[in-house]
Amino acid sequence: RECITLKNVDLSNVTTTGDYAFFRCWGFTGELNMPKLTAPGKYLFRECKNITKVSAPVLENMSLYMFAECTALADIDMPVLKKVENFSFNKCEGLTKVDMPTVETVVAGAFSNCVNIATVNLPNVKSIGGTVFNNCSLITSISLPALQTFTGGAFSGMTGLTSYDVPLLATLETVPSSLFQNCKSLTAID
């Protein structure tokens, strides 16, 4: 934790980590390869500002704030990921897209303040939390064909959103609070 001069670490055999294990290790640069990681601790790589790519081929569930504020992170390789936890990628300004076809659950704030995300591919997401894409103003459309449940504020703060394809919304009898709060570009709700 806060080993700001630590430049690299061999994670090739690591399956589990404690909380804050590499929090603020600013010396980490380039790619993190975690071929066996299955149980990451909370805040694991938070504020590791120079990580550019992450590979975790067997990871199914992320941890809270796992890569939050990893501002250079641009490439994510997690081919079996099922769950993105609270604020896992908050303020990851290097991300320009979300391409996670295996993900089924995205929890509150997961991609909030990722200001350069422009495209989203989450075809199998069944559940999303609030403010998942808050302050992601470059996202103009979103498609969530498999969505089954969401919380209030699910699309809140998507200021560039102009259209959406979310079949579940057409079946609602009650609209949750803050569903489209601050979606300033949205002109119609079907």
Predicted regions and their residues:
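Structural signature of tandem-repeat unit edges
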Residues: 3-16, 27-39, 49-61, 71-83, ...
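Consensus positions within tandem repeat domains that build extended binding/scaffold surfaces
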Residues: 18-23, 41-46, 63-68, 85-90, ...
